[in-house]
Amino acid sequence: TDDDMGNSEVGHNALGCDQIYSQGAKLVGESIESGALYESKTWKSLISNCKENEKALHFLGLLSDGNVHSNISHLIAMLQKARAEDVKRVYCHILLDGRDVPATSALEYVDQLETVLAELSDSAHEYKIASGGGRMVITMDRYEANWPMVEKGWRTHVQGEGRQFASAKEAIETYRAENPGMIDQDLLPFVVAHDGKPVAKIANGDSVILFNFRGDRAQEISLAFDRKEFTHFDRPGYTGVHFAGMLEYDGDLKIPEHYLVEPPVIKNTLTEVLCKAGVHEYAISETQKYGHVTYFWNGNRSGKVDENLEVYEEIPSDVIPFE
């Protein structure tokens, strides 16, 4: 729309189905505005876990209003609702953008978030930023191109490992001073700490919400939280959390198991029509766009419609920084 930035994922959805659906930011925004998100079984379960078991609530995601992967307004709305429902301890693990928004705009969003967190905090309620880092350095890998990047995020958010700062603002300003020209997406991981101890680590039994709505860069960290059987990196001491994504990021693979907003069901995609007609289809791309010509093209579904009619070929991308 005129208000929201488009992207190649939404474009491939549209090309692959030739239909109009509410998705991503609009879908989530409608759910928040109507209150449907807060009436969902998943939201209620996450909140009741915090209150009944005295657990913390954690929000993890991209902190910006780029409206491509996430929107800070969604995070703020959920923070305010959590406070209204008397959740005592709430922590934000923020990924810095600089890609879908101006390259060095992180402090604008951090300041906005810190203002809200201060308003929600009092002697009985602790609402704080706990950790973070650049989106192209930790947590938000896609298409299994760089699992060590996800592991860095895990160690930062869950284990509280990494360079410590008194605040997210101090971390950003320090990294910029030490690395002239570095943009937000490339900022190194940081842990907010007081007296040498992390403000909050994601602990076993806590409630965790991944507030990104786009699926490609949300799936791998979702698997790390969601799956008992997980082999991509070690998760020392981890026995599980109450985890939910903003949306179901992959319907076929059921990633994640729990989510806050029901995704649109995209039917009668071009691939389905071609397969019904017996037409062969060949999809080829390098890794970083492979999901666009398969997953997004096919209506946010993994796998093939017809193994006998479709051929997918992935050309591995080089693992290099995105500028």
Residue ranges and their predicted role:
Residues 67, 216-217:
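Short acidic, Gly/Ser-rich segments with clustered Asp/Glu that frequently serve as metal-coordination loops
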Residues 15, 190, 305:
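Short clusters of hydrophobic/aromatic residues that line enzyme substrate/ligand-binding pockets
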Residues 101, 105-197, 201-203, 209, ...:
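Long, well-ordered, tryptophan-enriched scaffold segments
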Residues 59, 200-204, 217, 283-323:
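Anion-binding catalytic surfaces of enzymes that hydrolyze or transfer phosphate/sulfate esters
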Residues 15, 210-211:
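Short hydrophobic-aromatic micro-motifs
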Residues 1-137, 148, 152, 230, ...:
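Active-site nucleophile/metal-coordination loop of metallo-enzymes that catalyze phosphate/sulfate
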Residues 24-25, 139-140, 200, 218-222, ...:
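Short helix/loop capping segments that flank catalytic or ligand/cofactor-binding pockets
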